[in-house]
Amino acid sequence: MDMVAHAEINNLSFVYADENEKALQHISLSVQKGEFIALAGGSGSGKTTLLKHLKKELLPIGKRTGDTYYDGTLLENVPDLLSAQEIGMVFQNPENQLVMDTVIQELAFSLENIGLPSHIIQKRIAELISFLGFQDLLHQSVHTLSGGQKQLVNLAAVLVMQPKLLLLDEPTAQLDPIAAKEFLGLLKRINEELGITIVLSEHRLDEVIPLATRVICMNNGRIVYDGSPKRVIANMWEVEGFRPFIPQIPRLFLEWNAKDIPFTVREAQMKMNDFSAISYVNEPIVQREKQEVILSAEHISFQYEKNSPLILRDLTVSIEKGKWVALVGKNGTGKSTLLTILAGLQKARRGKVKWNGKVIHKIDSKERFKSIGYVSQHPYYHFTFDTVWDEVYERARELYGEQGKEIAEQQLKKFWLYALKERHPHDCSGGEQQLLALCTTLLSKPTLLLLDEPTKGLDPWKKERVGELFRKLQKEGTTIVMATHDIEFAAKYVDQCMMLFDGAVIMNDAPKEFFSGNFFYTTSINRFIRKELPYALTWEDVYEACPNDMLHS
């Protein structure tokens, strides 16, 4: 007798209200108990829409055909209480799910809503906190937590319901590399020790693939590959358009035509036969000629309230004209705050910011708004209109008058948004919202770009195109300062990296020196082969240096 699938989708197609293009096309999928499924695919490929079709409360509004079942029951017929308890969902933005003031209130909230007695609530919270190990956070205000801690609380608030199926939509998109590793490690424990089934949508596959029992790759609302991680990665390798989605370590070994593909640093090192064969010379890094300082922060200190801790303390930094600078560091170290101060959106408690030699707050606001482009880590903060078209067209018309319509059309096509022009910005995927915010910001051709997590939510292919666009802007004289958790992107593209810690810049160097000196804040490729190739940061760096006869036969 066949086992009943934990969740099952039969020939599901879906079109959002007021749209013509199908978001999902003929999806058939069976999820077995205990699986750890990674959903991969481009921005807007249907991953989030598919996840929402596995929980009845999240079913999007539109026209659908086909059926979805949970434990053999049609999803629409699953009792509300059962759905709330057994199917949990964690979203991309840590801020969006928190509703209470303290951590313990957040954990108790959902249990109180389903009417559990207080002694059961206390027992569940105590047991869960012991499992997760964050007793110290229990009575803290959720507003004082870092992004990683907030996402941990979101996960805990779902786990306290003792779910059987856990859905996660890019849960590490806003987490620093260390917090992301900790979060994903916790998901592995939940899956292995508690037997909870996990379906996870994620662009950063480097850390997810080794955990997954199965990978599903989507494109244009369809499932194109479905199978074991090794099988799906091999299938993706056969199609040029999917190769950017393959994580760095397996990508390197596929380039080497290896038969058995490793996914982790340990597996990769075990496959290397003879490191002495490396044809590489550690030449000194060429120092670039220093340029004029265009932006400076001098002895900046900042706190949100008079008696609150300092976010930035006596921070001094100089940005040279035409440079692309990455700010990295843990959630809560002040990267976003520094960007808003550099943009003139917030004023430092002490110290001065100068742009082109002028104190930033003494520059006319209209001139500042046109010449300095700022994109928040929450792109929806930028949206004021009801359609993607209006967001871009109204700004283009304001800047260019009668030419605005033509320029808006060109800009939307440039950022792969033209097909979405009638969609409400808040109905776009996280990556599409990111592109829309960039699209409108770049209309004024700013000479200084201040970007907070610009690659968040972007699939690897679009990320490469955005990287190329920023390089082109650099060549035209644009200066870029970018806060990012995307170590691979920074390693590949930027000129300079700065690490913030305890409110100050503690490291400031070119990418090769910066990342080769780090243990955690570096790329998977560098961790794999740092002793032999200390400055290798990408698979391309290693491929150029290492012949493929170094592999075990």
Swiss-Prot record:
**Entry keyword annotation includes Membrane:** yes
Q: Where are the transmembrane segments?
A: none
Q: What does the record give as EC number?
A: 7.-.-.-
- Give a Gene Ontology cellular component term annotated to this protein: ATP-binding cassette (ABC) transporter complex
Indicate yes or no for the key word Membrane. yes
The membrane topology term of the UniProt record is: Peripheral membrane protein
Keyword annotations for this protein?
ATP-binding, Cell membrane, Membrane, Nucleotide-binding, Repeat, Translocase, Transport
Q: Name one GO molecular function term.
A: ATP hydrolysis activity
ABC transporter domain span: 7-245, 295-527
Q: Which PANTHER family match?
A: ENERGY-COUPLING FACTOR TRANSPORTER ATP-BINDING PROTEIN ECFA2 (PTHR43553:SF27), HEAVY METAL TRANSPORTER (PTHR43553)
Q: What is this protein called?
A: Putative ABC transporter ATP-binding protein BCE_3323
